[in-house]
């Protein structure tokens, strides 16, 4: 395996991809309305019907499933549990797959640390299994997954676009793809008679963190080379291919670890009557288009019908160059704790999932069947085309995939970021079972995050509490500058020197940080503030919350800067931070369990 490099996103892309595996990160919840059930491969499963099906006897199977299908599988598991397999009662528990799952498998699963051990893993895509096998081979260890991993359901990658915009490009009659988006990114919507829509803006997740981002990145390389299969390392290194991919990447508004950020922000814009102003397109799975159009961007069946359908629906563009499927493989682990009895239940549950009634349930939630057949929801009326995709791409070999991720790290849109860290007195509180304070954990997480920035990025650092610089609640520790060796050393030194003192001057600092980045805005970069706090505003002479939000709205009308906030510790004002992030079309992250801060920082930096 490649060793970590001192380059942003060239930091062992396999390591990053393997650790997150396109799933949730243990201890972390992106605070945009998603359901938090405490589940996760390695998290505690929620109590439900299947946990009592065999009254504590028989064979219990734990399935770790990717987010988009976890709730559906949980319901199926509850219906399945109680069956007899090999003369024993079988019960199946479904948890949400997490990044910590693979890390725990790699080091040797510790139930005290990692929670219940999974017996089956069903990520969104087989690509993650290929990466895991590659990692095992590189470290000369046995792979915890075999080579036979049948699909339980499928959904192709599409380019989702507000319907009026897609129709302006010729949808549904005209074949469209990545090359069309590249051309559009070079001009604007004025070329298509809609100057009011402004520049073309693409939403795409980070390929190290998200299946849709990974498949979209692979798809752009195929489009760049004109190939439909057998992508090679040489193809990925081709200068013309790199130029094509870089052109697509530079139309990005920001990246991230989940498409839910884009879809939730788009829903809020639509609610406000500005659904054509946020993004022009976003790379998502086909199922997500239906979920969004039902007013349910989380895709959680329990929230379906609780929000109105959008005024401006999305439609799916199936890239004419070909696309990849998220195939939801079903991988029975080859670890020592998966004995013959569990294997028998795993095989029987797979048969159950692939049977007609369960396949209908998948297709009733806008998945395609395990063999790729569309159900009744895949219709043009729903913005989906059942005859598509006409061309299907196969994931490249793991070594080529590694090259794709490394190349993307060099070609992605650069970042222009200000990190703002709360150093109020409460940050000195000790975090149980760690031997460290909240500030010490946050400093280490921020230092670790620096390794993910590189020489194309610019990063600066502020600290804040109250009256840090005269009457100002904040103090610049390192100006925003190119992340060369000197700046990296400067940032690390300033972070390590932070000490806790004072109150929390949140509102004044937030607006000042936003304006600071606004004044150094780069049209060629993702401009953002990363704002971490463990408290609530305690400066009585500061702006009010309404004043802060009004100021952010005014500034947002100029050049776009996004404020990604982190609610750190139980006393953080999560509701306020959510409002700050929403008004800047970003996202708030929940780290109320301070031990999760390193993982949270990783997720936040995935936006750049």
PLM feature spans:
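Short beta-strand-loop
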Residues: 430, 457-497, 516-520, 541-546, ...
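Periplasmic-binding protein-like
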Residues: 146-159, 242-256, 304-336
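Ligand-binding pocket segment of bilobal, Venus flytrap-like solute-binding proteins
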Residues: 222-316
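A conserved helix-loop-strand patch within extracytoplasmic ligand-binding domains
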Residues: 137-210, 222
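Early extracytoplasmic/lumenal segment of secretory-pathway proteins
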Residues: 9-17, 27-138, 143-146
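VWA/integrin I-like adhesion module and closely mimicked acidic/polar interface patches used
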Residues: 302-311, 535-583, 587-592, 596-604
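Von Willebrand factor
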Residues: 413-482, 509-510, 528-532, 565-568, ...
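Extracellular/periplasmic juxtamembrane helices and adjacent flexible linkers that interface
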Residues: 2-39, 55, 331-421, 432, ...
